[in-house]
Amino acid sequence: MSTSDSLFAGSIPEVYDRYLVPLIFEVPARDLVRRLMRDEPKHVLETAAGTGVLTRELALQLPASTRIVATDLNQAMLDHAATRLTSPDRITWLAADALALPFEDHSFDAVACQFGAMFFPDKSRGYREARRVLRPGGTFVFNVWDRITENEFANVVTQALATVFPDDPPTFLARKPHGYYDAAEIRQHLTVAGFASIDADTLTAISTAPSARDVAMAYCQGTPLRTEIEARDRSRLEDATQRSADALARKFGSGAIEGRIQAHVITASR
């Protein structure tokens, strides 16, 4: 995996949280928490926490006595996440690699990961670590995006950028966030990691945004797609963003727009 594929630094965390989180992450976060609440966990680990959208939902919905440890590979994302919570006492923030978790065996009742597994360079190793830190009977709940053609905004942005850089189209969105969607492959990785009880559902929702420009900002400047654009021509970031916005407006209209998002939600028990 290219280092830039998992690097959320510089201005990316702020733009990500401002534009991308409300666009595509809030509904799936609430869905994950609903699934976790069924088992009433007392100690929850979150991996790949990003700017804390799932963390905030966990803190809001789970009992005050539930302890939450939120980890991410990128310290910049955690730093931004910590500024968004007004009652941080129950949450521990820790920069940690999901493939090498710094916790003892059987430390948590539940492990949650929102849209992070796609970035694991070794999927089974990441799942094996989640299983290792789970107590017997514990639950690992995570989601991954479906293929890019089932996620309309991301698909239009990717197509638009191919016209900006026809000789070397940026492929980050199709390759990473939307590149790990095969249910059989996911199940195989979990089985190799030692999970035996595995369930998978598909979550479909409608994403809304105040404008096409907001969506273009979310993807072009709030994800590592920005790094791909700038690697091709740093001076064309604004042009690439605007070309994406124009393509979105042509397809979805002016003013507020909406488009389909789709993800797979997986529950695996230890």
Residue ranges and their predicted role:
Residues 5, 13, 51-53, 176-270:
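Conserved Class I S-adenosyl-L-methionine
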Residues 10-23:
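Class I SAM-dependent methyltransferase Rossmann-like catalytic core
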Residues 22-42, 57:
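Conserved alpha-helix/loop element of class I SAM-dependent methyltransferases that forms part
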Residues 43-101, 110, 125:
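Class I SAM-dependent methyltransferase SAM/SAH-binding core
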Residues 45, 107-115, 263:
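Short SAM/SAH-binding signature in class I
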Residues 109-124, 146:
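A short SAM/SAH-binding and catalytic strip from SAM-dependent methyltransferases
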Residues 124-125, 132-210, 226:
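Conserved catalytic/acceptor-binding region of the Class I
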